[in-house]
């Protein structure tokens, strides 16, 4: 069975001396494939295996074996992002958020389009770290786990204080905040709502010029939902192909 899909390369790991295993993000979700001789300098599709490469990938799939790369054509290497460290770090944060939150082969057309658009607009941002944090918020919203109500998840009372706490996407009053919750000021909550509801990237770029401390809080909020030790079961490697 063949799969032809646009995708963005997220990571490539060596497999033996000459081969590699690559994970891409596509409208079909995360897909992982085996590239025979992928580490070779003369491999035809080597550029398509480099992280942060947008391309079209033709994969062969014979379950339970891992997919194999048949052909790839690179469409965009995001050269500007890769040439500036702050942009590369921001793109890396978004990449890791996809790897840490999505399951293999979970269809994600909307999220793929969102991720691609964020990468395209990232070089325009004056605050790449906050722009990447905005993507984390959008991802939480996409997954339906970002509480935008005005009530505490524990006591169900309206939060009237100047600050409150967020944990695992939910809101808590000061009295019922979990130990590892992140404190949010009302001003920050207003920015959060504006970012989540913004429909135009020009608005997102403007709103992302907020202070860096808030981006750190967003990252902590995201990490409280999606942990690094989340395991994804991959198909059987076809190292002998």
UniProtKB/Swiss-Prot annotation:
InterPro entries named in the record: ARFGAP/RecO, NA-bd_OB-fold, RecO, RecO_C
Gene3D superfamilies reported for this sequence: Recombination protein O, C-terminal domain
Any matching Pfam family: RecO_C
Single GO BP term: double-strand break repair
Record HAMAP family: RecO (MF_00201)
Protein task: Involved in DNA repair and RecF pathway recombination.
Protein's name in the database: DNA repair protein RecO
Upper taxonomic lineage: Bacteria, Pseudomonadati, Chlamydiota, Chlamydiia, Chlamydiales
């Amino acid at each position: 069975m063949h799969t032809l899909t646009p995708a963005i390369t997220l990571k490539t790991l060596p497999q033996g001396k000459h081969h590699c295993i690559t994970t891409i993000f596509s409208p079909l979700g995360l897909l992982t494939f085996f590239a025979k001789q992928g580490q070779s300098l003369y491999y035809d599709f080597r550029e398509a295996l480099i992280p942060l490469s947008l391309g079209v990938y033709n994969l062969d799939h014979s379950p339970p074996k891992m997919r194999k790369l048949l052909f790839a054509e690179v469409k965009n290497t995001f050269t500007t992002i890769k040439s500036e460290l702050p942009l590369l770090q921001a793109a890396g944060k978004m990449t890791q958020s996809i790897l840490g939150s999505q399951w293999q082969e979970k269809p994600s057309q909307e999220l793929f389009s969102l991720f691609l658009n964020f990468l395209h607009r990232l070089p325009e941002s004056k605050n790449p770290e906050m722009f990447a944090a905005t993507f984390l918020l959008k991802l939480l919203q996409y997954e339906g786990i970002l509480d935008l109500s005005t009530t505490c998840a524990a006591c169900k009372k309206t939060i009237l204080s100047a600050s409150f706490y967020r944990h695992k996407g939910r809101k808590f009053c000061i009295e019922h905040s979990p130990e590892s919750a992140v404190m949010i000021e009302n001003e920050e909550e207003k920015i959060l709502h504006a970012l989540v509801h913004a429909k135009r990237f020009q608005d997102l770029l403007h709103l992302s010029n907020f202070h860096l401390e808030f981006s750190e809080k967003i990252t902590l909020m995201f990490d409280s939902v999606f942990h690094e030790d989340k395991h994804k079961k991959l198909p059987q490697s076809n190292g002998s192909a």
